[in-house]
Curated annotation (Swiss-Prot):
The gene is ddl. It catalyses: 2 D-alanine + ATP = D-alanyl-D-alanine + ADP + phosphate + H(+). Its EC number is 6.3.2.4. GO terms for cellular component: cytosol. Belongs to the D-alanine--D-alanine ligase family. This is D-alanine--D-alanine ligase. It comes from Enterococcus hirae (strain ATCC 9790 / DSM 20160 / JCM 8729 / LMG 6399 / NBRC 3181 / NCIMB 6459 / NCDO 1258 / NCTC 12367 / WDCM 00089 / R). Mg(2+) 1 binds at D295, E308. Mg(2+) 2 binds at E308, N310. Pfam families: Dala_Dala_lig_C, Dala_Dala_lig_N. It is an enzyme of class 6 (ligase). It is found in: Cytoplasm. Cell wall formation.
Amino acid sequence: MKITLLYGGRSAEHDVSVLSAFSVLNAIYYTYYQVQLIFISKEGQWVKGPLLTEKPTSKEDLHLTWDPSGKVTDGFTGRVINPGEIKEEGTIVFPVLHGPNGEDGTIQGFLETLNLPYVGAGVLTSACAMDKIMTKYILQAAGVPQVPYVPVLKNQWKENPKKIFDQCEGSLLYPMFVKPANMGSSVGISKAENREELQNALALAYQYDSRAIVEQGIEAREIEVAVLGNEDVRTTLPGEVVKDVAFYDYDAKYINNKIEMQIPAEVPEEVYQKAQEYAKIAYTMLGGSGLSRCDFFLTNKNELFLNELNTMPGFTQFSMYPLLWENMGLKYGDLIEELIQLGINRFNQRQGFFEANE
């Protein structure tokens, strides 16, 4: 069977995607699979690379080069294709794409239009989980605790910034955290200790999205639970992100590696059971399939607040998701195998729904 690996992408998380793809390629069982590389450049070109039958030697091999004219010429490692050309029989797509145009439902909708099986969550789940404001509305209705927050639209802020500042300061206390509504890997997030910093933080967030969310800052540990499955959902014991930085931003995650992971997290039994329960509720309410990682805040009073649910968590060497499953006895290669089977099962189920409506 062939796996079509989509990676790169136009989002700010392009480089993270390449790192994740390299790790996935080193975990796949090549005895059973061939892997077709499809690299999406930062400019949006889809570049078809070689068909791999063994592990790549370097992640630099994944940065495919191509002739801008689109011709197949010597000296280049790939060729530009139309996105629809990825459709093949006997293949499943693994979209190792993070952020907008990757895990926000757009690529999932495209793959469903092509009628291709793929790994991970569907269109609606991906779109809702990627949007921090929508996620909070849904999970609030489901009774999953979250920190206090204020959604802020860019046009509202531009029309009357004082009203927005008053609204935030009337509902929240400093420090506050400001985030783009649609972005991952902590891109565009900043901490505000006063009104001036809040203004700067909103300006930064609006560089990535026209919608932002302002959250109450709290003193808390950060624990994460991995979720796997379609209808039959399994969770891991939580792991903890141990930081030596003010907050877990993009550079801390992927550039400076200023974090450590404690797996499993040292928390009371009732805390990890509650985290697993909330993770299952969140996953189910959002219609999850395949995989997700649920991130929580844990206060010194053992209060849990769900921060976010990632439908395509990082798969790099520093990433929590595969490490959490490894701690549960599921090897990286076996995890990939399960994800592929879950994607096939979901596709077959969806085909059955179409046939039932004919």
